[in-house]
Amino acid sequence: MYAVIETGGKQYKVQEGDVLFIEKLANEEGSTVTFDKVVAVSKDDKVSFGTPFVSNASVTAKVLCHGKGKKIIVFKYKPKKGYRRKQGHRQPYTKIQIEKINA
């Protein structure tokens, strides 16, 4: 059994027990999160697609930790003009574990 959920503007295919790195959520570590935006559910070799979401379907997950991703360096310059700008960015994420798929 698997489901496709939408969170943070992205879609993820999940199964029970999966560990995911998703866009940062405001929930505390150790708390549970329910995702109601389920795009598709597969159960007993039958796939149900939503329009846009499957009704009466949800996915429950546990928040494991929060963190920051690898540093990305953004460097802009204009040749022959002495214009240089260097900036770094680390994207925050939330690590979750899928506990249950309700369909």
Swiss-Prot record:
Keywords: Ribonucleoprotein, Ribosomal protein, RNA-binding, rRNA-binding
Superkingdom field: Bacteria
InterPro entries: bL21-like, bL21-like_sf, Ribosomal_bL21, Ribosomal_bL21_CS
Chain coiled-coil ranges: none
RNA-binding keyword on record: yes
GO biological process, alphabetically ordered: translation
GO CC term, one of those recorded: ribonucleoprotein complex
SUPFAM superfamilies recorded: L21p-like (SSF141091)
Record PROSITE patterns: RIBOSOMAL_L21 (PS01169)
GO molecular function: rRNA binding; structural constituent of ribosome
Subunit annotation: Part of the 50S ribosomal subunit. Contacts protein L20.
Function as written in the Swiss-Prot or TrEMBL entry: This protein binds to 23S rRNA in the presence of protein L20.
Family in the record: Belongs to the bacterial ribosomal protein bL21 family.
PANTHER family: 50S RIBOSOMAL PROTEIN L21 (PTHR21349), LARGE RIBOSOMAL SUBUNIT PROTEIN BL21M (PTHR21349:SF0)
Name of the protein described by the UniProt record: Large ribosomal subunit protein bL21
Organism name: Acetivibrio thermocellus (strain ATCC 27405 / DSM 1237 / JCM 9322 / NBRC 103400 / NCIMB 10682 / NRRL B-4536 / VPI 7372)
